[in-house]
Amino acid sequence: MKKTIPVIGMACSVCSANVEKKLQSLEGINSASVSLASRTALVDYDPDIISLEDMKREISNAGYDLVIENDRSVEEINRREFTLLRRRTLASWLFAILTMCFSMGWISHTSSFANQICLLLALANLLYCGKQFYVSAWKQFLHHTANMDSLVALSTLIAFLFSTFNTFFGEMVWGARGIEWHTYFDASVMIITFVLTGRCLEEKAKDSTASSIRQLMGMQPKTARLVTYEKIEGTNDYKMEEVPISTIQIGDMIEVRAGEKIPVDGVVTQAESFMTADAAYVDEAMISGEPTPAMKKAGDNVLAGTIPSQGKLRMRAKQIGENTALAHIIRMVQEAQGSKAPVQRIVDKAALIFVPAVAAIALITFIIWWLIGGNAALPQAILSAVAVLVIACPCAMGLATPTALMVGIGKAAQKQILIKDASALENLHKINALVIDKTGTLTIPNQNIDFTKQEDLDLETRETLKPHAQEAMKQLQEKGIEVYMMSGDKEEAAHYWAEKAGIKHYQSKVLPGDKQALVKKLQDEGKQVVMVGDGINDTQALALANVSMAIGKGTDVAMDVAQITLMSDDLLALPEAVKLSQKTVHMIWQNLFWAFIYNIICIPLAAGVLHIFGIDFQITPMWASALMAFSSVSVVLNSLRLKLS
């Protein structure tokens, strides 16, 4: 059983890696993938062995929280968390401004009164605005782990305690020896302020990456017009009642009027419009991508989320709740956005050692400055170590891949391209061979002819090419992808359709096993193969291919096996999917490059490495916190550029 569960308390990629590792260690869980970007865990588990309550208890023991209550949606949780974050950020800015005024402007920096006021302001900032960092760091400490919150908590606590010591004993310890001393409450406050500000901006940006899910969820109406069994007096019609969609049962009769969203999947029992007495026209563009409204008569199926554009219809509920086609699409997109690309698993392993490595670098920095710092050795050593702890940013590494994937998968869904898992989107850009089934995939059979006499029929009469098939094949081949058409037809027919579609390679008289054999042959030649099919006889080849695609109007078996489903008959979705994969992967590597380069350059600068070369430049803790906030926000904003492409 698969389920997507919201996770509370994750601050960086170390957190998501810890939660994932803990879930995977539990008996009864087949697989678990935790996404920092969506703050969810995609868990495949056996409910007979482990329950959601068991998972929640184990994750709570590890310092995080799983939200398993059905009445608490991810949207609601994220909204509440963001409201609290924003409130603390605004309060932190107030404390920061007051602290800066007292420490730098109004009264002398060494004034005992000013330092005591700054101490109180910094303490209030730590206890209220920075509470989440210390609670999280303490939980991590109890479980012998560390995350980004640990770095923030440690650095601000060191700066605060050192400043508190100087406030009460500075003159006695340092002044008596002729050493100039300072307090650094402003650094402690500004670190928390900048980190909170960065997280606020990051959350807003991440919220934009999930817009595709919200659009899909927006297609689900909240209420339905239920046709009751109570007749209207003096007529043969029945009374209707507006009810919550959650109360609809299978078999209920529902009326939907023009412009309203169909609430559940069902079968039309009655339809009418001003154009046709016995039919209504339903806009299915959001599901199938077809721009022309489909005619629906009694006996036709309709899907939740689609909209009658003309007329009204009555329907009997067939699939409700999580069993509707729309719910399945939403679930598929959520699971895909929560899944991990292969490169993300490598980053997660690096993230697990990142925080201990940064702590070690900070300790080494402290020792070196303590030894070579002269009279101001201790303050310089402390500030340098604090700057190193603050500037390190595992968040940027953790967000680099999932944010790009979330935007890419969401954008694909808007184009009626449903991607089941992140690895398919990542691998699609590598393909250099495409195997496509002819009938039902490349062409549309004519349903209005007698196939017992098809030998006497013209090829064009039997079937037609799908929309933009020639242009799609041309674009694929221009990208360097070799296209192979597989057909069960005789040589003459196969040659005709291959030539008409602009395909150079084709096979005729193909049996189901031949498709699998061709995929294997191409792979043995070193090619990365994508298989596109729509029928049961394509499933073996789909399962073997590096990337598999099914047509949305094909069989359920083919769609279950395929990693990518094209909801539209427009084959331009094929090159569009490849193009989107290329852009997404390019964005991932851009993000990773920035995340690693940022840490590689900024950590040494914060440690003061330029002093070795006689350059008197070093990043202060205050600027370090600003740069750290900027680094994670920039990664998310860069990923959002995909939405504009």
Cite the ranges covered by each PLM segment.
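Conserved ATP-binding TGD loop and adjacent catalytic N/P-domain core of P-type ATPases
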Residues: 38, 419, 429, 442, ...
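Flexible metal-binding regulatory segments at protein termini and peripheral loops
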Residues: 1-115, 230-238, 327, 331-339, ...
